[in-house]
Amino acid sequence: MEQNISINEVMQAGQEKQLYRVLWVSSDQEYGYWISLEKQTRVPEKFICQEVIENISVGEVVVVEDPIRVYERNVAESAKERRDEWWRILKPILECEPDIYERRRRGELLSETAKKSNKNKANLYRYLVKYWKKGKTPNAFLPDFRNCGRGAKTQNQKKLGRPV
């Protein structure tokens, strides 16, 4: 049975059991690019498909369910507008696969886009990485509010400080 590696598949690999998202695979399944979902790295890594398939067959690499889901429900209209703006700006360079995964070419593409869109190159790169890590969908550009706020803890009713 011939196994293929699919785009957007999430795999757990290595001794540290790191999660990786497959970003692109060549048409002949020779090589591809993936990015770590857990490390702070922002650079896609090249991999050899045959090695990954062999590691899957021996259990060193496991295909897992996608831990990052981005939904559109309960999203403010302003957030949708911001998402659409970033999608419009980055879409031309996102279509330049596999060039976008090579460091030098990615820098050139981002510089050109920064000049055209009047946006900061660092911000473009930040949104590009966000797009890769969150599943290569336009909804990846939505604001990430799930980690904001205090949480469900109640405040202490007793006032702090010296008694009056």
Please provide the spans of the model-predicted regions:
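Secondary-structure boundary/capping micro-motif
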Residues: 1-164
